[in-house]
Amino acid sequence: MGGQLKVFAGQSNPDLALSICNSIGIDPGLIEYVCFSNENIKVKICENVRGCDVFFIQTSCPSVSDNLMELLIALDALKYASAGRITAVLPYYPYALADSKDEPRISVASRLMADLIAEAGADRILTMTLHSPQIMGFSRIPVDQLSGVPTICAHYAELGVDNAVVAAP
């Protein structure tokens, strides 16, 4: 897509979105959220996105379900506002650990998330290193995963730490 670049943010982490926008030298997109008394939400895109290359940033921090619904409704609003291409930027992929059926009668929620995000209007998903590479195969749209390892290694090398050990679950 050759459309103008626009970045919008969900309410889960506005500071992250502002930092990203500042680093690439653009203003965040204008978006309005209304929460009704019954806890339903409305998302309004407050500028023209027709034909634009849109990135929507939303983290899956608590409240995961609320942030997920906000993401889906925002993607749908962008789709119906005729955005040229929509990339869902998800620093932490929702339900990433639910990537297999390890007991009977349970959902593979990670696959469901891929379906919902694509159906809502995303053309691509951009996320950080996934728990399991099979998650990329769940999606019918492209999934790009970025790694933080080079940045972390460079940071500790700059500090002069020679034999650091990193442990993670």
Locate the predicted segments by residue.
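PRPP-associated nucleotide enzymes
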Residues: M1-P169
